Every structure is written in C-alpha cells, then in structure tokens.
Amino acid sequence: MAVSTELLVLGVYGALAGLYLLVVPAIVYAYLNARWYVASSFERAFMYFLVTFFFPGLLLLAPFINFRPQPRSLNS
C-alpha cells in the first residue's frame, strides 16, 4: 500500500501548520510568562521577534489563556 505523493504533501503541510499555529505559540506563551520580568534587553528584543513571527498562532490561542496575576492574600 503506497502512500500517494499528494497525501504525503498534504500531511506535511498539515503538520507544519499545526506546528506554526498551535505548538510553537504555546511554547512562546510559556517562555514569555516565565521570563517577561527578568529578561535583558537583548532577550526582550528576541521576545518581540517571537511575538511578531508567531502572531497568528498567538492570536488563535489568546482567548484560551489567562495570564492575569493571582490575587494576593492580605493578612491583617
């Protein structure tokens, strides 16, 4: 059972699209969340590049992610 070339090309395109739109932006979100407040200026420029490059995927994942700060406890 040979796989046709068209099906193979379609599978590769689907895998690359999933990687570009879902997998890498999720990794970028995790990286930004971990390093945002402690990054150097060069690292911050790299972060801006990542956001620009993976913007469509970040836009797709944005409604499902909540990075608001947790409420702090006030002990009195």
Curated annotation (Swiss-Prot):
Keywords: Membrane, NAD, NADP, Plastoquinone, Quinone, Thylakoid, Translocase, Transmembrane, Transmembrane helix, Transport
NADP among keywords: yes
Molecular-function GO terms, alphabetical: oxidoreductase activity, acting on NAD(P)H, quinone or similar compound as acceptor; quinone binding
Localization (cell): Cellular thylakoid membrane
Enzyme class, first EC level, given as a word: translocase
Cited PANTHER family: NAD(P)H-QUINONE OXIDOREDUCTASE SUBUNIT L, CHLOROPLASTIC (PTHR36727:SF2)
Name recorded for this polypeptide: NAD(P)H-quinone oxidoreductase subunit L
Natural source organism: Thermosynechococcus vestitus (strain NIES-2133 / IAM M-273 / BP-1)
